Curated annotation (Swiss-Prot):
Comment block on domains: The N-terminal domain determines nucleotide recognition and specific binding, while the C-terminal domain determines the specific binding to the target protein.
Lineage: Archaea, Methanobacteriati, Methanobacteriota, Thermococci, Thermococcales
Protein's gene: mobA
Keywords, ordered alphabetically: Cytoplasm, GTP-binding, Magnesium, Metal-binding, Molybdenum cofactor biosynthesis, Nucleotide-binding, Transferase
Binding positions (Mg(2+)): D92
Entry protein name: Probable molybdenum cofactor guanylyltransferase
Binding site for GTP: L6, A7, G8, K18, D67, D92
The UniProt record lists the keyword GTP-binding: yes
Function description: Transfers a GMP moiety from GTP to Mo-molybdopterin (Mo-MPT) cofactor (Moco or molybdenum cofactor) to form Mo-molybdopterin guanine dinucleotide (Mo-MGD) cofactor.
Cofactor(s) required for function per UniProt: Mg(2+)
NCBIfam families referenced in this protein's UniProt entry, alphabetically: PRK00317.1-3
Main location: cytoplasm
EC number(s) recorded for this UniProt protein: 2.7.7.77
Amino acid sequence: MIGAVLAGGKSRRFGEDKLLFEINGKPLVLHTIERLEGCSSIKKVIIVASPQNREAMEEFGYEVVVDDLTIGPISGVYSALSLGDAFVVGGDMPSLIPEFIDYIIKQFNNSGKIACVPRWSNGYLEPLHAAYSKNFRDILEERIEKGLYKLGDAISSAKNVCYIKIEDLPLGWRESFFNVNKKEDLHRIMQ
């Protein structure tokens, strides 16, 4: 399965391109990629970039897919799925837990569903820590054409989704969902 790192955001709350911000001597996005590469189920890592940051992302030596739509995570996932089934994460998720990702991919492969998404008991989804079939791209395309850009709503509208109940999983795996939004968040990973 492809590991797709979404790297097309604008980093408004961070104040600068957070994915290029160096933490312990390397850019944030590389911390995320290294964790993803630690997954036995991931055969190839790609970066989904915006047209504006394509060149910066190409510097890391990974295949870069450009999200020309840049309408949010929905178009990033849409772009990633052009290459096949993918496990999608945000580029600002440096605490990914490879065992958890492998678990989700195994559930996805065994389920035969169009997507496998972690879900909290209150219904909140973790769509940027999920496995998607390339066939989910058709659903995304239809929603994008209608101007419906919320990835969570696209997932909820699909009838063939595997949901993983987060509360039933090891407590430590929840750290995998952590993402950096503001500079204050960096203390969690700089220790």
